Amino acid sequence: RAEILTALSQLHDLGMRHVSVDGGEPLTHKHVDEITAFLVQRQVRVYMNTNGILVPRKLATIRLLSKVKISLDGPAACHDAVRGEGSWRKAVVGALAARDAGVPVELTCVVGRRNVGQIEELLAFADHARFSVVFQPARNSLFVGSARDGGAFQLEAAEVRRVFRRLEAAKLRGCAAVANRWSSLRHFRDFPRDVPPPCAAGFINATLDPEGNLFHCGQLSRLGRSANVVAMGARAAFEGLARHGCSQCWCARVVEENYAWGGRVHRMLPPLGVAEPTLRASRRLK
């Protein structure tokens, strides 16, 4: 506990003002209440990625958050087929509890072969419940360490582009439930691009694991553990991070941050217009 708080204090001294708490399930951590309060007292905005199950029992901590983020793959049958029977209901109960506590709720939908036909149904649900949804494509790296076959779930590149052109068109029509910013929608409707996006990893952000290991990017391999904030101190660990991008990026909020950091203003503005693609019958959005 003391080591965690010391590391966070040192990172705050370096300028840390926004933290996204992930897991596993962060609400099961025995110090999550204290850590969240510690950060908020220092004017740090705290987002939390949770499965929603413990949200109704942790409302005192939930109310401190700037945003609650919950994965939802689609309607109940679609979500439960991937994550287990009853998981949709538990996620939605948690999302509603956070919303009713006054905390903004953002759903994350990983678009793949099993849920591509339910995107518009998910948007209708989110709009009715006053949630927003961030969409991003399924990639193999999302399934590392799990028993699920990422290759069987992800779409072909052309299918990804069609889906995100439809989402971009929906946002242009005023669909408030599409929470992606223009830069990630543009990125994914051209995905994968020949030209890699700018990458802020290791410059203005980093990923810290429970053992104190610091990584320039949480989306890449975490095998290299040469920068530990407990052993080295936060400044030395951060300054020693690798600073190199990758050929692509699939995480919507990271993509948006990267384009903003790189000053790609033309990618951040709404397009003049997007023609909605005609999907094959087997892929038609309901």
Language model features with spans:
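Glycine/Thr-rich phosphate-binding loops of Rossmann-like dinucleotide-binding domains
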Residues: 56-57, 78, 259
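Flexible mid-to-C-terminal extensions adjoining Fe-S/redox cofactors in radical SAM and related proteins
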Residues: 194-198, 211-286
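Conserved alpha-helical substructure of the radical SAM core
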Residues: 1-58, 279, 286
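Conserved residues at the C-terminal ends of beta-strands
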Residues: 22, 71, 252
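Radical SAM enzyme [4Fe-4S]-AdoMet core and its adjacent flexible, acidic
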Residues: 42-45, 60, 66-67, 71-73, ...
